[in-house]
A protein has these predicted regions:
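Short beta-strand micro-motifs in enzyme catalytic cores
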Residues: 42-44, 70, 109-113
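Vicinal oxygen chelate
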Residues: 15-20, 74-118
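Conserved catalytic-core motifs of GNAT/GCN5-like acyltransferases
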Residues: 12, 35-38, 101-103, 127-132
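N-terminal beta-strand motif that seeds the catalytic metal site of vicinal oxygen chelate
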Residues: 1-22, 129-133
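Glycine-rich acetyl-CoA-binding "A-motif" of GNAT/NAT acetyltransferases
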Residues: 122
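Core segments of cupin and vicinal oxygen chelate
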Residues: 12-53
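Long, continuous compositionally biased terminal/linker segments
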Residues: 2, 47-88
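Short beta->alpha transition motifs characteristic of CBS
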Residues: 107-108, 114, 125-132
């Protein structure tokens, strides 16, 4: 996937236990070769060159909650990186929500996995094998 192929600038998730969430995402983002890009009081971002993914305390002071039917997928560079994401997420406390593997209902090129982060947000790592598309 080309670096400029995304239509998304960035995504933010709310966290009820900010420091725990930052520790979780430090491990998960490292598995995808992403690093911390920016930090502000109550907010941290990760990416591969610009702040693509943020975790923050909700600005309105209310509790963070999950969106029913919503999830975020991170681009993996290989099937092995999908597995690394899975392993890192589970080791950091995520709940499994779909083991790594192909899902032909999403297309022959799809390979990915799903987990629930510490606040219950559904996150995914996806590898798109162009040779199978």
């Amino acid at each position: 996937m080309a670096e400029d192929s995304s239509i998304i600038s960035h995504v933010s998730l709310g966290a009820n236990h900010f420091e725990r969430a930052v520790g979780f995402y430090d491990a998960v983002m490292a598995s995808l070769a992403c690093s911390r890009i920016m930090e502000h009081p109550g907010a941290v971002s990760w990416g591969r060159g610009f702040p693509e993914f943020w975790v923050q305390t909700p600005i309105n002071g209310a509790a963070a909650s999950q969106g029913n039917g919503s999830h975020i997928s991170f681009v993996a560079a290989s099937k092995a990186q999908v597995q690394q994401f899975w392993d890192a997420a589970l080791a950091a406390g995520a709940q499994p929500d779909g083991e790594p593997g192909p899902r032909e209902e999403y297309g022959k090129a799809y390979y990915g996995c799903f987990v629930r982060d510490l606040d219950g947000h559904k996150i995914e790592a996806t590898y798109w094998d162009q040779s199978l598309a």
